[in-house]
Amino acid sequence: MANKKSPAATWPVANGEYVLGNPESCVGVITLGSHGLDQAAVDAGAALSGPCHTENLGIEKVVANYISNPNIRFMIIAGSEVQGHITGQCIKALYENGIGDDGGIIGAKGAIPFMENIGKEPVERLQRQIIDCIDLIDVEDTAKIAAAIKNCTSQDPDAIDEEPMVVDLEGGEAVANTESTSMKPTSPEMALLEARMKIVSEKMNEAAMIAKFNSGYYNGKIQGIAIGLFLSILVFSLL
């Protein structure tokens, strides 16, 4: 029988729209932007399942909840990708590459993939603890998700040989086996607004470049006509 550890007393330490299962399960499921998949995932054997909409605070909550339960060793990313945020790809990039000194997720393609409240230590703990990240992004077939969960539970490798790590999401500090955690107020709506502002800015820059090109083309054309007229007058004056 697999060796298990008790998760943090307040697990899951970060609030969210989660459905909880057996805390001794070795599988956690992230359903990204989809709805109606979480209960089926838990019924199939997941420790918890819930959505993740944003590539910053949303992912921070995932990290906090996973590393505070040493039993979770597999992470399944399923459900529809969140447009603009590209949260699923950002989670994979975090697991595979970690974060830079500026808190940015290395290789992430989302709009604002920065860990403001999570430092390198919790991210590295997640990378040690999770032995496999299963990519089912854009899969909403509950049978396929359930099959992936059962495949993971059949390979249960025991809990990681470390104590639960609880992260203060406001201070970014990691504490082993403590109970307190706090949130910095951020909303998915604000992150979406920032993402849209970034897109608008990029479109404005593209429009400015096109206008600059067109302006240069038009000015060059006028100059060419003027030079042609001057040369024509000069030639006729010499005849």
Curated annotation (Swiss-Prot):
It catalyses: 5-methyl-5,6,7,8-tetrahydromethanopterin + coenzyme M + 2 Na(+)(in) = 5,6,7,8-tetrahydromethanopterin + methyl-coenzyme M + 2 Na(+)(out). The keyword Lyase does not apply. InterPro entries: MeTrfase_MtrA/MtxA, MtrA. Residues 1-215 are cytoplasmic. Its cofactor is 5-hydroxybenzimidazolylcob(I)amide. Keywords: Cell membrane, Cobalt, Membrane, Methanogenesis, Methyltransferase, One-carbon metabolism, Transferase, Translocase, Transmembrane, Transmembrane helix. It holds the Pfam family MtrA. 5-hydroxybenzimidazolylcob(I)amide binds at residue 85. It is a single-pass membrane protein. Binds 1 5-hydroxybenzimidazolylcobamide group. Its main location: membrane. The chain crosses the membrane at residues 216-238. Pathway: One-carbon metabolism; methanogenesis from CO(2); methyl-coenzyme M from 5,10-methylene-5,6,7,8-tetrahydromethanopterin: step 2/2. Part of a complex that catalyzes the formation of methyl-coenzyme M and tetrahydromethanopterin from coenzyme M and methyl-tetrahydromethanopterin. This is an energy-conserving, sodium-ion translocating step. Belongs to the MtrA family. The complex is composed of 8 subunits; MtrA, MtrB, MtrC, MtrD, MtrE, MtrF, MtrG and MtrH. This is Tetrahydromethanopterin S-methyltransferase subunit A. It comes from Methanococcus maripaludis (strain C7 / ATCC BAA-1331). The gene is mtrA.
